[in-house]
Amino acid sequence: MYKRQVVKISGTKVIPVNPGKANVTITVAAGTRYAAASKTVTITVIPAKTSLRSVKSKTAKQATVTWKKAKSISGYQISYSQNSSMKKAKALTVKGSATRATLKKLVSKKKYYVRIRTYKVVSGKKYYSKWSSKKSVKIR
């Protein structure tokens, strides 16, 4: 089975390559004043986040969300709520390289908060980026 490279070691640096988990073992040779030691660290690499371009409500009970396109990802997850703390938020998943989505069945005359994050599927597991900053919109 081929394992995808998650990180690359370059001198004394660990460079993220792809989303996923990697075990990195650090080894120190024995010296005159200390014994040899090694430590294994698990590193989780997540995709880069994206940002919202705009959230607009031009028709009743709907909002159109547009965002900046991210590279090398499987899709996006949009979260929206009437509460600014995003409690009881609903989610919409958009696969592929789309840069726009429409939120439907919203309540008219109410303010909604929207945020977005990217995800990458690696070996059947989804790795999510951090959330973007929130934008708000009043629904027509």
Predicted regions and their residues:
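Pro/Thr/Ser/Gly-rich low-complexity, intrinsically disordered linker/stalk tracts
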Residues: 46-72, 125-140
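Extracytoplasmic soluble-region selector
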Residues: 3-47
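Short, solvent-exposed loop/turn segments at the edges of extracellular beta-sandwich modules
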Residues: 29-34, 121-127
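Beta-strand-rich modules
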Residues: 103-124
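Short beta-strand/loop motifs in extracellular/secreted proteins, especially
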Residues: 5, 74-76, 112
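Short S/T/G- and acidic-enriched coil/turn segments that sit immediately N-terminal to beta-strands
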Residues: 97-101
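Extracellular low-complexity, O-glycosylation-prone stalks/linkers
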Residues: 72-92
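Hydrophobic loop/turn residues within beta-sheet-rich immunoglobulin-like superfamily modules
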Residues: 17-19, 70, 106
